[in-house]
């Protein structure tokens, strides 16, 4: 923990094409080795694929997908009297978004399609339709929290 007080939250600039901070955060999550231009190109091509397939605005589809991925509850390990309990806690809004974006990118990378553009587009489309690996991850997280509901009184 810093001695000089809380660290200031850095604000991201909205991306030039969609003027959205959410898109910028997704680009930053996708970026590998500081290659932001490459990540940007991949995302924009994915959005083009989504627009082509659905006929809807890619941004709306992406926002719906993210809404379907973001978890409401998660479990945190809490040590009580020599035993570790998985305590269900509510996820803060900022962390919800971060987890949603992280899961979206991670599960898109694990898909079998040939290019990253296709993988990301398909994962976003699946998530928008409430299917896909990222949505399954959210469901598993919620199931875990539900299963450990008995330890909710250990919340801090």
Swiss-Prot record:
InterPro entries: Ribosomal_uS7, Ribosomal_uS7_bac/org-type, Ribosomal_uS7_CS, Ribosomal_uS7_dom, Ribosomal_uS7_dom_sf. Keywords: Ribonucleoprotein, Ribosomal protein, RNA-binding, rRNA-binding, tRNA-binding. One of its GO terms (molecular function) is rRNA binding. GO terms for cellular component: small ribosomal subunit. PROSITE patterns: RIBOSOMAL_S7. One of its GO terms (biological process) is translation. It comes from the Bacteria. It holds the Pfam family Ribosomal_S7. Belongs to the universal ribosomal protein uS7 family. One of the primary rRNA binding proteins, it binds directly to 16S rRNA where it nucleates assembly of the head domain of the 30S subunit. Is located at the subunit interface close to the decoding center, probably blocks exit of the E-site tRNA. Part of the 30S ribosomal subunit. Contacts proteins S9 and S11. This is Small ribosomal subunit protein uS7.
